[in-house]
Curated annotation (Swiss-Prot):
Domain GIY-YIG residues, every copy: 26-105
Gene that this sequence comes from: uvrC
Family: Belongs to the UvrC family.
GO BP annotations, alphabetical order: nucleotide-excision repair; SOS response
Species assigned in the record: Acaryochloris marina (strain MBIC 11017)
Compartment(s) of residence: Cytoplasm
Stated name of the protein: UvrABC system protein C
NCBIfam families, alphabetized: PRK00558.1-5, uvrC
Length: 626
């Protein structure tokens, strides 16, 4: 179905566009928009595919900026026909979850809202709080994002006190469990003192709490407690009693007065300006507010109803059927209320209603959710204004032609030349963009233990960063997403001069804005200036540069520590070809130390399982060079 990839978009090739649009039938289904690299830009669904896809290419200037940008990148269109619109919605949700197209990511990656992660992909899953969803492992489950991080931490702390769960990312000891096992906080997963099946049964109970099913869990535990008492297993009954008592305290101060406490319901509302929509979703179970989720969405993606529709599709599309509420209260009518309700009802296998309440208690609940969304929007606007002020001040301070969109900062870390590394951190629009961070190992042979050279190290790293533009002069520079509007060097005049000399050799220095920030007096140096820039250390632009430098310093130190630890853990046996980790363990088990291995003869070495005559001779020759 897909033509050969062309560098010309469909939009510019009108004949090809018309031919492709005629191939699309007026039936329900899902459509894919691909760019010139064959990457999926967007996945959508429609009751009539042809009409929906055609609408993107009519009066493009009237589309929101995000959609207009996407349309200009479309090089091909594919489609899948379905029998019904509901099937198209279900297929769209699965495909978006699988491919994560750039223009489908309506929800912004906002780090202030944390998730709870359960790593079902592991034999003994962990449960922990994180601010980043990792999409690599489909089995792992995320709950959230939660607005009240303090309440989330309190709940998780209570859960870990009531249920024995894996506490550590890595075992503390190789041959015995740690103190958490002794005090009953962990079932000894590091030593496999509990089977994976039994451990997962415990974790399934814990997950019910974060699915809003605490009442159901309490009922289950109560039945188990009664059965344990009947079996005269009083210790188990007492443990279950304590768990029930602890769980009954969850949410007691968050009672929401609604007419039917038995119905599970969610209430969702938003507040928006011309850029951002702050969405709040309250989860109410048995009349209690058990979860408060927050989302940041692109306000230019459509009407308020359309934004709510997309948020609900994204949120419920990744939820388990058991987590879906029976009633969803919305702030405003959705464009496709019946379709979404039908889709959720099919997944839940029970009727799910979506209503926009106008009177009485439910309307008051929506007003409360909307009020919370307005508070979140005000906080977001304040933070955004503070960042914008810092960028404006920095542009004025450095006489930049426009506000710096992408700022890069570089730092070096080592101990007297050993394990020398460098960091590159990136701020986009004044905020950390960790997906663009980079680490470098210093390759300069003159930089080694006992001999450091920060000037040469920085020159090397900046040369490696920008040499691709020297090798490919036709490659676009300024105005592209990968080209920095400002480069910051951690250091003084000497470091700046070394970097400028290196970049001059590869003919990129003329297109870069470069400064350095000296540590001691927080002085800013510019190319060609012998004296530092006169600044006030408290002005917003300077504080932004200092935050950037501190982040580069932190990132460099963390990488240096990692490399140093790897070197310290490295065994001399690692240098022997053919001697892998398993064989090293066999040798150390037989001889107890490297000193004894060094003293062993080839005959003694080959007596160890998995060590043949040739490898035994290699090991002997390594320790006894001619």
């Amino acid at each position: 179905m897909t033509d050969a990839v062309s560098t010309t978009t469909l939009l510019k090739d009108r004949d090809r566009l018309e031919a492709r649009l005629k191939e699309i039938p007026p039936e329900p289904g899902v459509y894919f928009m691909r760019d010139a690299n064959d990457d999926i830009l967007y996945i959508g669904k429609s009751k009539k595919l042809r009409n929906r896809v055609r609408s993107y290419f009519r009066q493009i200037q009237d589309h929101p900026p995000r959609i207009e940008l996407m349309v200009h990148q479309v090089a091909d269109i594919e489609f899948i026909v379905t029998d019904t619109e509901a099937e198209a919605l279900a297929l769209e949700a699965n495909l978006i979850k699988q491919h994560q197209p750039h223009f489908n990511v309506l929800l912004k990656d906002d780090k202030k809202y944390p998730y709870l992660c359960v790593t079902w992909s592991q034999t003994y899953p962990r449960i922990f709080i994180t601010r980043k969803r990792r999409l690599g492992k489909a089995q792992d489950k995320y709950y959230g994002p939660y607005v009240d991080v303090w309440q989330l931490r309190q709940t998780l702390r209570l859960v870990k006190r009531l249920f024995p769960l894996r506490q550590r990312r890595k075992p503390l000891f190789k041959d015995r469990p740690c103190l958490n096992y002794e005090i009953g906080r962990c079932p000894g997963v590091c030593q496999a003192l509990i089977t994976p099946e039994a451990y997962r049964q415990i974790l399934q109970k814990v997950v019910m709490i974060f699915q809003g099913r605490t009442s159901e869990l309490i009922n289950t535990l109560s039945l188990q407690m009664e059965q344990a008492a009947e079996d005269l297993n009083f210790e188990q009954a007492a443990r279950l009693r304590d768990q029930i008592k602890g769980l009954q305290g969850l949410g007691v101060d968050q009672k929401v007065a609604l007419p039917d406490d038995t119905v599970s319901r969610d209430a969702i509302a938003l507040a928006a300006d011309d850029q951002i929509a702050c969405v709040q979703l309250f989860q109410i179970r048995s009349g209690r507010l058990v979860g408060r989720l927050g989302f940041m969405a692109d306000a230019q993606s459509g009407s308020l109803g359309m934004i709510l529709q997309h948020v609900l599709e994204a949120h419920y599309g990744s939820a388990e059927p058991v987590e879906l509420p029976l009633e969803i209260l919305v702030q405003t009518e959705l464009p496709e209320t019946e379709l979404l309700a039908s889709y959720l009802s099919q997944r839940k296998e029970r009727k799910v209603s979506i209503t926009c309440p106008q009177r009485q208690i439910k309307a008051e609940l929506i007003e409360m959710v909307e009020r919370n969304a307005q508070y979140e929007l005000a906080r977001t606007q304040k933070s955004r204004d503070r960042t914008l002020n810092a960028l404006q001040d920095l542009a004025e301070l450095l006489d930049l032609p426009e506000l710096p969109h992408r700022i890069e900062c570089y730092d070096i870390s080592h101990i007297q030349g050993s394990d020398a590394v460098a960091s590159q951190v990136v701020f986009i629009d004044g905020l950390p963009a960790k997906q663009h961070y980079r680490r470098y190992k210093i390759r300069n042979p003159n930089v080694k233990a006992g001999h450091s050279d920060d000037f040469a190290s920085l020159a090397e790293v900046l040369h490696r960063r920008f040499r691709q533009y020297h090798l490919s002069p036709e490659q676009p520079r300024q105005g592209t997403s990968d080209w920095p509007d400002l480069v910051v060097i951690d250091g003084g005049k000497g470091q700046l001069s070394a970097v400028l000399e290196s970049l001059t050799k590869i003919e990129v220095v003329e297109d870069l804005q470069i400064i350095s920030l000296a540590k001691q007096r927080e002085e800013i140096f510019q190319p060609g200036e012998s004296q530092p820039l006169p600044t006030d250390p408290e002005q917003p632009g300077v504080q932004l540069i200092r935050r950037l430098r501190d982040e580069a310093h932190r990132f460099a130190i963390s990488f240096h520590r990692k490399k140093r630890l790897e070197r310290m853990r490295r065994s001399r046996l690692d240098d022997i070809p053919g001697l892998g980790h398993h064989r090293q363990k066999e040798l150390l088990a037989a001889f107890r130390s490297i000193d004894y291995i060094r003293e062993a003869s080839p005959e003694q070495l080959k007596a160890v399982p998995t060590i043949g005559p040739q490898l035994a001779q290699k090991i002997y020759d390594y320790f006894h060079p001619a």
